[in-house]
Amino acid sequence: MKNTMKIAFAGILIALMFVLSWTVLGMIPLGVASATTVFIPVCVGIIFFDDFKYAVVFGLFFGIVSLVRSFVPQGFLDPYFQNPIVSVLPRLLVGIVGYLIYKGLTRLMKNRIIVSSLAGGFIALINTIFTMGILILVYFQDVNQTFADNGFSILTALKTISLLNMLPEIAIGAILTPIIIKVLDKISNKNLN
């Protein structure tokens, strides 16, 4: 794929992140927090481009989208994401670590569909782990009090977030990512299976 086409397609994926973040398809309010599908363009970008620089860019823009979106909160944890350490840093790490996971998977197996599915699931998983981990590291006392004010213990809240956010996000990432990659491979004649 020519460089101009790569940049244009990267721009489309980044624009898609912004569009998803402002629709119910991308940010699904669940009361405690918002489940997201905004990571799907990140998964697709990491796998389709197979380029560390692009993975960093996709992770960075995922974080910027989260930061911008936090100023119109839907869940009671969303205002904490107005801090770039909580919104941008974990998503930047998702781009970096997601790329490393993808590259590791490509060394273990050659089937691009299976690799895409596993990478999509793992990227969703690390998104939740990094985001919740950094949120709790930075704002433990505040988050603990926020949960208590809303009738939750922090442990119960984390279990709830894991069930309501993480598991569906993993499933969505594992299902949608390979479907999109397969279509893009056919379109770009980049079928590597």
Which sequence ranges carry the predicted segments?
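A short hydrophobic/aromatic micro-motif that marks alpha-helical segments and, especially, helix-coil
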Residues: D50, V65-V68, D142, V183-L184
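Membrane-embedded alpha-helical hairpins and interfacial helices in multi-pass inner-membrane proteins
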Residues: P29-A33, Y80-V88, L93, L100-I101, ...
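Short alpha-helix boundary/capping motifs
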Residues: C43, P73-Q74, D149-N150
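Hydrophobic transmembrane alpha-helices
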Residues: M1-V57
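Interfacial aromatic-anchored transmembrane helix boundaries in multi-pass membrane proteins
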Residues: V19-A35, L60-V97
